[in-house]
């Protein structure tokens, strides 16, 4: 399954091809790929066709396409121009909890976001816990169990279409194609853009989905609402506090999208190896110093993978069909039974949270 670096790479590849383009046609080849309130082909097409794309971003493992259907946030009373500036797009994405796709060297610079548009260091959108380990107070998104105010009620009644959310799951791919390219055998949805460019959502195993999101449906979507903080945007203290107060094996917690968003099997194994932590260690037994080290190594691994355009094991390709290269740098993932590249000990395998896990019994304690 594509993880944070792969989805970030795809978003960066799609951004120049999609931004500013209008969607002039939608063809749904597999209705089961549509999810959410607007999940019939007719409703989905009506909501999406004619929308202009403002930007492409990411939240956890979700790839997000934001539409230019709202006036610029923070510029009340001023109409949104057809030529979208980067500042208005950024405002739009920040307000609705999107993370704008950056480049390999700047992706981590995005600020932690709140869904109401406030930027609050150490907190995240729609989640009950702050990144700093403290509880959030005040208004939250409808349906989170928090305090409702007039803004929250307005969100609950607002069906303005915000954009598209893609979850690629195991075999989902998003490709840019030239005009008149025919749909393939695994193409599930086609988006035709002005100028003739075509965006294909391909998915061989049909586990992936695309969801047309409105302000209301976004606020009420449990998966979105419960996503944990972005690992590239947390500070070490908050990351450590978040893990230390939970009981469970450290790798299982890293894989839990409610705890940390975007981390999967590859980057959990690789970061735990670099931190010298066995993946089956109970998180609450780790010292703050070891959790701080894990935080740093996790960020390093994610950034290095983004710089290499992700990891291509079987199905992953970027928006132009190219493979990533970080798999060439794996120290443990997929190398069970082979010698550790650090000490030469045979790498062991185990099952953690239902996932095959590789670690070094000598280097990881």
Swiss-Prot record:
SMART domains: Fapy_DNA_glyco, H2TH. The active site is at 2 (schiff-base intermediate with dna), 3 (proton donor), 61 (proton donor), 355 (proton donor). DNA binds at residues 186, 205, 246. The keyword Hydrolase applies. Binds 1 zinc ion per subunit. It catalyses: Hydrolysis of DNA containing ring-opened 7-methylguanine residues, releasing 2,6-diamino-4-hydroxy-5-(N-methyl)formamidopyrimidine; 2'-deoxyribonucleotide-(2'-deoxyribose 5'-phosphate)-2'-deoxyribonucleotide-DNA = a 3'-end 2'-deoxyribonucleotide-(2,3-dehydro-2,3-deoxyribose 5'-phosphate)-DNA + a 5'-end 5'-phospho-2'-deoxyribonucleoside-DNA + H(+). Residues 134-150 have a biased composition (Polar residues). The keyword Hydrolase applies. Keywords: DNA damage, DNA repair, DNA-binding, Glycosidase, Hydrolase, Lyase, Metal-binding, Multifunctional enzyme, Zinc, Zinc-finger. Its EC number is 3.2.2.23, 4.2.99.18. One of its GO terms (biological process) is base-excision repair. Its cofactor is Zn(2+). GO terms for molecular function: 8-oxo-7,8-dihydroguanine DNA N-glycosylase activity; class I DNA-(apurinic or apyrimidinic site) endonuclease activity; damaged DNA binding; zinc ion binding. It holds the Pfam family H2TH. Belongs to the FPG family. Involved in base excision repair of DNA damaged by oxidation or by mutagenic agents. Acts as a DNA glycosylase that recognizes and removes damaged bases. Has a preference for oxidized purines, such as 7,8-dihydro-8-oxoguanine (8-oxoG). Has AP (apurinic/apyrimidinic) lyase activity and introduces nicks in the DNA strand. Cleaves the DNA backbone by beta-delta elimination to generate a single-strand break at the site of the removed base with both 3'- and 5'-phosphates. This is Formamidopyrimidine-DNA glycosylase. It comes from Nitratidesulfovibrio vulgaris (strain ATCC 29579 / DSM 644 / CCUG 34227 / NCIMB 8303 / VKM B-1760 / Hildenborough) (Desulfovibrio vulgaris). The lineage of its organism: Bacteria, Pseudomonadati, Thermodesulfobacteriota, Desulfovibrionia, Desulfovibrionales.
């Amino acid at each position: 399954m594509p993880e944070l670096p792969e989805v970030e790479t795809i978003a960066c590849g799609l951004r120049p091809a999609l931004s500013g383009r209008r969607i002039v046609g939608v063809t749904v080849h597999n209705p089961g790929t549509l999810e959410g309130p607007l999940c019939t082909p007719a409703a989905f097409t009506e909501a999406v066709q004619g929308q202009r794309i403002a930007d492409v971003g990411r939240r956890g493992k979700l790839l997000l396409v934001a539409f230019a259907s709202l006036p610029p946030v923070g510029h009340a009373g001023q109409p949104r121009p057809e030529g979208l500036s980067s500042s208005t797009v950024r405002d739009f994405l920040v307000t609705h909890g999107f993370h704008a796709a950056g480049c390999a060297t700047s992706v981590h610079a995005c600020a932690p976001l709140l869904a109401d548009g406030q930027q609050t260091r150490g907190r995240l959108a729609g989640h009950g816990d702050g990144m700093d380990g403290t509880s959030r107070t005040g208004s939250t998104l409808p349906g989170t169990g928090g305090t409702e105010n007039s803004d929250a009620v307005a969100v609950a009644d607002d069906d303005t279409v915000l954009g598209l959310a893609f979850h690629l799951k195991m075999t989902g791919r998003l490709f840019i194609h030239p005009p008149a390219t025919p749909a393939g055998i695994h193409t599930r949805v086609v988006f035709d853009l002005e100028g003739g460019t075509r965006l294909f959502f391909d998915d061989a195993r049909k586990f992936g989905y695309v969801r047309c999101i409105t302000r209301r449906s976004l606020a009420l979507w449990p998966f979105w609402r419960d996503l944990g903080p972005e690992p590239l945007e947390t500070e070490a203290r908050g990351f450590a506090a978040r893990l230390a107060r939970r009981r469970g094996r450290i790798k299982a917690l890293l894989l839990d999208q409610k705890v940390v968003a975007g981390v999967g099997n590859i980057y959990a194994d690789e970061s735990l190896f670099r931190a010298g932590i066995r993946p089956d260690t109970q998180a609450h037994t780790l010292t703050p110093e070891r959790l701080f080290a894990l935080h740093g190594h996790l960020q390093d691994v994610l950034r290095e993978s983004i710089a290499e355009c992700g990891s291509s094991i079987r199905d992953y390709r970027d928006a132009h069909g190219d493979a990533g290269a970080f798999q060439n740098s794996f120290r443990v993932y997929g190398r069970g039974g082979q010698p550790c590249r650090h000490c030469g000990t045979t790498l062991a395998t185990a099952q953690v949270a239902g996932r095959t896990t590789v670690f070094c019994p000598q280097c990881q304690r």
